[in-house]
């Protein structure tokens, strides 16, 4: 399966997950959703490794740490933004990650001097984001500006995390290992917020939503990680 196809499927699953997160935010805090999402991901990947073989031991723990840190922060902020914004607005702000990636890569190319970035790809990314904005038609009220700023920051952090995913894939780290440590980071961060702020009681609907968020996110992360490892970064970003 091509990287572009993997990215499209991943984006579809992430969008579906966003809907589930919006509904789940009526029952749980963003920290709780991050925690349970991480639990589902870590357990699923651990079971896959146990059944199919492989190893969770990594030669680059520092890279996984920084990828997990930026990714979990981005995820937590996005879930928080989803809870306080119209879903279309929250999704649009998250899709800003592709624009941030283009800016980061362009800035890096300028600083490095010799590196070249295809201007057509950057134009494609910007056009893609404009198309998303036109379709979703995001709106925001004055009392939602804080959540909007949080959503914007989450998109920037997501771009950083995606670039780190690309770097991990380029050095040969398998996607299951990348997703496992990211999920583990979510468990730790979510647990800390729950210790500080407490936890809400479960309902059947709430548990079903948490399970859906975890499964959709895990599969989407695996597909996205493979896409960034094998495809062109900006091409993937334009499809996100």
Predicted regions and their residues:
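C-terminal transmembrane-helix exit sites in multi-pass transporters
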Residues: 80-83, 97-121
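Structural signature of hydrophobic alpha-helical transmembrane segments
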Residues: 26-43, 82-100, 144-157, 203-217
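Helix-helix packing/entry segments at the starts of transmembrane helices
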Residues: 90-96, 172-185, 221-240
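Juxtamembrane helix-loop-helix junctions in multi-pass membrane proteins
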Residues: 12-40, 160-185
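Transmembrane alpha-helices of multi-pass small-molecule transport proteins
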Residues: 3, 28-73, 101-104, 157-161, ...
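Transmembrane alpha-helical segments that form core, pore/gating elements
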Residues: 45, 139-198
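Hydrophobic transmembrane alpha-helices of multi-pass small-molecule transport proteins
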Residues: 103, 117-137
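Loop-to-transmembrane-helix transition segments
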Residues: 2-10, 49-50, 54-79, 146-154, ...
């Amino acid at each position: 399966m091509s990287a572009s196809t993997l990215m499209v499927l991943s984006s579809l699953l992430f969008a579906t997950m966003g809907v589930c997160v919006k509904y789940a935010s009526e029952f749980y805090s963003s920290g709780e959703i991050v925690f349970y999402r991480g639990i589902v991901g870590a357990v699923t990947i651990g079971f896959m490794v146990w059944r199919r073989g492989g190893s969770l031991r990594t030669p680059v723990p520092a890279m996984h740490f920084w990828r997990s840190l930026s990714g979990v922060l981005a995820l937590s902020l996005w879930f928080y933004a989803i809870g306080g914004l119209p879903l279309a607005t929250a999704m649009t702000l998250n899709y800003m990650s592709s624009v941030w990636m283009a800016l980061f890569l362009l800035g890096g190319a300028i600083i490095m001097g010799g590196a070249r970035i295809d201007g057509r790809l950057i134009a494609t990314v910007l056009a893609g984001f404009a198309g998303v904005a036109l379709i979703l038609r995001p709106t925001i009220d004055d009392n939602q500006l804080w959540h909007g700023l949080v959503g914007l920051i989450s998109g920037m952090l997501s771009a950083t995390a995606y670039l780190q995913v690309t770097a991990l894939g380029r050095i040969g780290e398998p996607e299951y290992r990348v997703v496992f440590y990211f999920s583990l980071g979510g468990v730790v961060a979510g647990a800390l917020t729950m210790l500080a702020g407490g936890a809400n009681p479960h309902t059947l609907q709430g548990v079903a939503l948490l399970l859906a968020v975890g499964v959709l996110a895990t599969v989407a992360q695996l597909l996205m990680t493979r896409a960034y490892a094998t495809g062109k970064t900006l091409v993937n970003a334009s499809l996100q």
